[in-house]
UniProtKB/Swiss-Prot annotation:
This is ADP-ribosylation factor GTPase-activating protein AGD5. One of its GO terms (cellular component) is endosome. PROSITE patterns: ARFGAP. A zinc finger (C4-type) spans 31-54. It comes from Arabidopsis thaliana. Keywords: Cytoplasmic vesicle, Endosome, Golgi apparatus, GTPase activation, Metal-binding, Zinc, Zinc-finger. GO terms for molecular function: clathrin binding; GTPase activator activity; zinc ion binding. The gene is AGD5. GO terms for biological process: activation of GTPase activity; clathrin-coated vesicle cargo loading; defense response to Gram-negative bacterium; floral organ abscission; leaf abscission; negative regulation of cell growth; vesicle-mediated transport. GTPase-activating protein (GAP) for ADP ribosylation factor (ARF). Mediates clathrin-dependent trafficking of vacuolar cargo from the trans-Golgi network (TGN). Promotes plant growth. Involved in the regulation of membrane trafficking and cell separation during floral organ shedding and abscission. Prevents abscission zone (AZ) cells enlargement. Exhibits ARF-GTPase activity toward ARF1 at TGN. It is found in: Golgi apparatus, trans-Golgi network; Endosome; Cytoplasmic vesicle, Clathrin-coated vesicle. Disruption phenotype: Abnormal vacuolar trafficking of soluble cargo proteins, and premature termination of the shoot apical meristem and of floral meristems leading to short siliques and abscission defect. Plant missing both AGD5 and MTV1 are severely dwarfed and have altered subcellular distribution of clathrin-coated vesicle (CCV) cargo exported from the trans-Golgi network (TGN). Floral organs remain attached to the plant body after the shedding of mature seeds, including abnormal petal breakstrength (pBS). Ectopic enlargement of abscission zone (AZ) cells during shedding.
């Protein structure tokens, strides 16, 4: 708010007359800094009259040090006029120039003014502890406001202002202390007042306990999420042995099976928990103590373990026993072992024949083939994935054995030469050993049969064939189909 607006024209004219009278005083006829005659400007903060040149320098110092006003043109406030009346040039210089040398050269007036008011170079050492005139000005302002001519409704004295400032924080602190005291709990005054709150607390505790019971019952009523997993697990079981094993006692199953049984019987255990936890909710009387809740939680595991756990491990092992799928690598290993056994049988038959003619050797080999094919038709009930066995049953197997015996009998005729053994093409399923002769044929690098007659003459004498030289792949041609 601009305080100059409150100054009326009559008051402004009165202030102007006062200032003109102050300028006529002998101490104020010269500038306070440069001693120029006829000053028309004044420093409101310092309470001195200065010339126009020094007024510009005072403006550069800042309003916190010197606030410049025109003595004849500007509007003055009542407190400013009262302060400059009390100060004047002589009184102000007695403070600012207390230690100034008597004939000091004031040529550099700007440096002189800055050293005088900013640096306080010539202020007496004892006077530096005292307040400068501008502080006294503030005090005078408060005194001016307390006068009867000041119409702004301020306090009567600066002392009262200071006392009011002290009382305001004190009252605030008292209110804060009172507020904190209200938040503190009130101590009990007698035994009669203590008994009633205890009864209220007991009555209030019963609904809280009932709410806790309701909260405990609510989760048990939710549908169990484990049922989906158990249903999926029951779908994977392949036999009905679980119904027989459910009658076993818990001690019959090992420790690791109990974990699987606990996983499968989780659904039935939750149903038992539903029945047990619903009983306190149905009863109207509240529980006597917290031990009842502990008993409820202690009883629930016993109910869940009453049912005998199912032999889940047996069900899982039955899955592996019932399966008919075997890896090709395992099947290949079994076939290699069987072929090695057949070779041993052929070698034994060849040694037993000794120098017998070719027909006898062929008969022994045919008998060995009957035994090997009977064992090899369905080894262990396994089947190679992607291949089917054409032999449907025992009747087909017997027909195949009869055909093999007929072929063997045809080969045992004495008039048949050695080259009759070439009637079966070499299309073996597995190539055994290195490039050996098979029925007078030698396999080349391209897999095509090549007659041994091109490399060596055909022997007319009967020679015994070993088991590894016999090729029975033609008999099994078509038994395996490609996937």
């Amino acid at each position: 708010m601009n305080e100059k607006a409150n100054v009326s024209k009559e008051l402004n004219a009165r202030h102007r007359k006062i200032l003109e009278g102050l300028l006529k005083h002998p101490e104020n006829r010269e500038c306070a800094d440069c001693k120029t005659k006829g000053p028309r400007w004044a420093s409101v903060n310092l309470g001195i009259f200065i010339c126009m040149q020094c007024s510009g320098i005072h403006r550069s110092l800042g309003v916190h040090i010197s606030k410049v006003r025109s003595a004849t043109l500007d509007t003055w406030l009542p407190e400013q006029v009262a302060f400059i009346q009390s100060m004047g040039n002589d009184k102000a210089n007695s403070y600012w120039e207390a230690e100034l040398p008597p004939n000091y050269d004031r040529v550099g007036i700007e440096n002189f003014i800055r050293a005088k008011y900013e640096e306080k170079r010539w202020v007496s050492r004892g006077e530096k502890a005292r307040s400068p005139p501008r502080v006294e000005q503030e005090r005078r302002k408060s005194v001016e406001r307390s006068g009867p001519g000041y119409e702004h409704g301020h306090s009567s004295s600066p002392v009262n202002l200071f006392e009011e400032r002290k009382t305001i924080p004190a009252s605030r602190t008292r209110n804060n202390v009172a507020a904190t005291r209200i938040n503190l709990p009130v101590p009990p005054q007698g035994p009669s007042q203590v008994i009633k709150p205890q009864q209220k607390m007991e009555s209030a505790a019963t609904p809280v306990e009932r709410e806790k019971q309701a909260v405990n019952v609510a989760p048990a009523s939710d549908p169990p999420k484990v049922d989906f997993a158990t249903d999926l697990f029951n779908m994977l079981s392949m036999d009905d042995s679980t119904t027989n094993t459910s009658e076993a006692t818990p001690g019959d199953t090992p420790a690791d099976d109990n974990s699987w049984a606990g996983f499968q019987s989780a659904g039935s255990g939750q149903t038992a928990e539903k029945i047990v936890t619903a009983k306190p909710a149905e009863s109207s009387s509240p529980p006597a103590s917290s031990s009842d809740f502990e008993d409820l939680f202690k009883d629930t595991p016993n109910l869940t373990t009453q049912q005998a756990p199912k032999d889940v491990k047996g069900d899982i092992m039955s899955l592996f026993e019932k399966t008919n799928i075997v890896s090709p690598f395992a099947m290949h290993q079994q076939q290699v072992a069987m072929l090695a056994q057949q070779q041993a049988l052929y070698m034994a038959a060849a040694k037993a024949a000794g120098g017998t003619p070719n027909g006898v050797n062929q008969q022994a080999i045919a008998n060995a083939l009957n035994v090997a094919s009977a064992n090899w038709s369905n080894p262990g009930g396994y089947q190679i994935p992607g291949m089917t066995n054409p032999v449907g049953g025992q009747a087909d197997l017997q027909k195949l054995m009869q055909n093999m015996n007929m072929n063997a009998n045809m080969n045992t005729r004495p008039a048949q030469p050695q080259e009759n053994t070439l009637q079966y093409p070499s299309s073996s399923f597995y190539t055994m050993g290195q490039a050996n002769q098979v029925n007078g044929m030698t396999p080349n690098s391209t897999g095509k049969p090549q007659s041994s007659s091109a490399t060596q003459p055909t022997s007319t004498t009967p020679s015994s064939q070993s088991g590894k030289d016999f090729d029975f792949s033609s008999l099994m041609d078509g038994m395996f189909t490609k996937h």
